[in-house]
Swiss-Prot record:
Transmembrane segments: none annotated. It comes from Rickettsia peacockii (strain Rustic). PANTHER family: ATP-DEPENDENT CLP PROTEASE ATP-BINDING SUBUNIT CLPX-LIKE, MITOCHONDRIAL-RELATED, ATP-DEPENDENT PROTEASE ATPASE SUBUNIT HSLU. CDD domains: RecA-like_HslU. ATP binds at residues 29, 71-76, 261, 328, 400. Keywords: ATP-binding, Chaperone, Cytoplasm, Nucleotide-binding. This is ATP-dependent protease ATPase subunit HslU. GO terms for cellular component: HslUV protease complex. A double ring-shaped homohexamer of HslV is capped on each side by a ring-shaped HslU homohexamer. The assembly of the HslU/HslV complex is dependent on binding of ATP. It comes from the Bacteria. It is found in: Cytoplasm. The keyword Cytoplasm applies.
């Protein structure tokens, strides 16, 4: 059954678990257990905020471990969940980290990046609220350049109307704008505060703000280009930076979602001859422990507590097992969800049902060339059949196999579409077979092509 967008009755605590699952169903096929687990975790966040007294701080999120092969929907579930709630969301592969003391990224950079995302989110939101005022101020600055500050109100009004109508878009003006040229020098970390890096430019900005001034330079540019530069400048002046940072830290601490992929790759498998690698992997796990359990991380915006950030870890666990993770880390990921491998029916649903399904995407792309692209039911079934066959015979990459199959299937149509205006193309099972059967039957070729 096709999931459709639904208008829900207003709930003071946000979406209910069943509503969250319904929303996820619009984009993701199957994996009901995983959807249910994340829906409960999200609702529990809302419940915690309504608990009064000291007990609220004692209620911590139940972090999730998703187990399943690639392409079955692990990342997509977490990503859609964050989008659904407008939560700061950060995805990272566990293999990118090294133990503290080794060359590479340390795990605390996860929180620094999460806060950066939260700050940008809050800043964008604040700028939309002052957009009209910022636009008016930008127009006033451009008018000063066009007709002078001492011009009559009648003249200014006349030129303002021309700016708004776009009549002066290609008129060149000379105007002072903020100098964004980076000052020479790199960035350095503040001793004792890893991650709280400060570049020379940042230091200059801080001094400029303290003195209530900033460096500007005069440039020649078109009115339309000036508007694009000055509106963000004026928005920056109108928003309260300190308030935004506080709101962003609060958002990251209470609503942040961190998705750690490939956590199975840092599990100790106990294989001989890889002692150093085992030590390094175990070191990364130990570094992750305080982060997931709850600690304070210093960032350039201030200290951030991780106690109530929701961590979702995932891995295929083909070689390692969840029990190969450190016992302490296993304990900090109490909810385990196993995602099922995709069946032929799942593949058919993935092609047809989601609001942003691949079939709809390709039809829309080709449609921009005034070519109508349609898929017969027999073609959809054949594509799904081939996807399952290659996944079984070559390597199981789940729904991602559909991308490579469709690219190969529609390669000629995509190339020639611009010369086929006004035509209708129907893809049936015979077309699919003609295009792909040689590749599918030759497994050595399929390994490279599909």
């Amino acid at each position: 059954m096709k999931a459709t967008k639904t208008t829900y009755k207003k709930d003071p605590m946000g979406l209910t678990p069943s509503q969250i699952v319904n929303e996820l169903n619009r984009f993701i096929v199957g994996q009901e257990k995983a959807k249910k687990a994340v829906a409960i975790a999200l609702r529990n966040r809302c419940r915690r905020k309504r608990v009064e007294g000291n007990l609220r701080n004692e209620i911590v999120p139940k972090n999730i471990l998703m187990i399943g092969s690639t392409g079955v929907g692990k990342t997509e579930i977490a990503r859609r969940l964050a989008k659904l709630t407008n939560s700061p969301f950060y995805k990272i592969e566990a293999t990118k980290f090294t133990e503290v003391g080794y060359v590479g990224r340390d795990v605390e950079s996860i929180i620094r990046d999460l806060v950066e995302i939260a700050v940008n989110t809050e800043k964008t939101l604040a700028k939309t609220k002052v957009d009209i005022h910022a636009r008016e101020k930008a127009i006033e600055r451009i008018l000063d350049s066009l007709v002078g500050k001492t011009s009559s109100s009648e003249t200014r009004e006349k030129f303002k109307e021309k700016i708004l109508n776009g009549e002066l878009d290609d008129t060149e003006i000379e105007i002072s704008v903020a100098d964004t040229t980076p000052v020479g020098g790199g960035s350095f970390e503040i001793p004792g505060m890893p991650g709280a890096s400060m570049g020379v430019l940042n230091l200059g900005d801080m001094i400029g703000r303290a003195l209530g001034s900033s460096k500007t330079k005069t440039k020649k540019m078109l009115v339309k280009d000036a508007m694009a530069i000055i509106i963000p400048e004026e928005s920056e002046k109108l928003i309260d930076q300190e308030k935004i940072i506080q709101q962003a830290i609060n958002l990251a601490e209470n609503d942040g979602i961190v998705f750690i992929d490939e956590i199975d790759k840092i599990a100790s498998t106990g294989s001989s001859g890889a002692k150093n690698a085992e030590i390094s992997r175990e070191g990364v796990q130990r570094d992750l422990l305080p982060l997931i359990e709850g600690t304070t991380v210093n960032t350039k915006y201030g200290p951030v507590k991780t106690d109530h950030i929701l961590f979702i870890a995932s891995g295929a666990f083909h070689i390692a097992k969840p029990s190969d993770l450190l016992p302490e880390l296993q304990g900090r990921l109490p909810i385990r969800v196993e995602l099922n491998s995709l069946t032929k029916d799942d593949m058919i649903k993935i092609l047809l049902e989601p609001e942003t399904s691949l079939i709809k995407q390709y039809s829309a792309l080709i449609g921009t060339e005034d070519v109508r692209l349609e898929f017969a039911a027999s073609a959809i079934e054949k594509i799904a059949d081939y996807a399952i066959t290659v996944n079984l015979e070559v390597e199981d990459i789940g729904a991602r196999r559909l991308h490579t199959i469709l690219e190969n299937l529609l390669e000629d149509i995509s190339f020639e579409a611009s010369e086929m205006k006004g035509k209708k193309i129907t893809i049936d099972d015979k077309f699919v077979e003609n295009q792909l059967s040689k590749i599918i039957t030759n497994l050595d070729l399929a390994k490279f092509v599909l």
